[in-house]
């Protein structure tokens, strides 16, 4: 019997850093060069194995534009994890990332797993944010950090695997609704015939 855990994950960060592209690459293994900016938020799901569980990621991709910033708490409330994305070629996006982390720490779920994704690592020749800086910052806040490229499918799966590994295992003695669905193989039963 394999348990399916539903894990709400939100993506936060500046507009244009590649949040939607990361989600599309992870869920659909697709990259769109002409993707439109997200309005409000978009939603996708993907289920992946993790140990003896299945993690069903309920992924909320939030808009990065300032005018939608006030909607973000609606998406990170109740989240098991948050992926805060910055563009390695834009120092300003790394500064904004720190504001998102501060907001999550003040208003987000207490035990939220935080992952920092430095996207567009395929453009490392025009890098503005050293990986060393991202690693030091991630360590200081207890987050995982991964450099990704949605365009070239670099470390996208690893990002979500890292989140899965940080999610505490289910307590087998816990009662109640914890977002888990039991999946069992159907058993063959002898059929009864009437008449």
UniProtKB/Swiss-Prot annotation:
Annotated phenotype, changing residue 65 to L: No change in GTPase activity
**Which positions does UniProt annotate for GTP binding?**
16, 18-21, 32-33, 38, 64, 119, 122, 150-151
| Any one GO CC term of the record | Golgi apparatus
Give the Phosphoserine positions (modified residues).
36
Motif: Switch 1; annotated at 30-42
GO function terms (MF aspect): GDP binding; GTP binding; GTPase activity
As for family, the record states: Belongs to the small GTPase superfamily. Rab family.
State the protein's name: Ras-related protein Rab-31
State the organism named in the record.
Answer: Homo sapiens
From the UniProt record, report the name of the gene that encodes this protein: RAB31
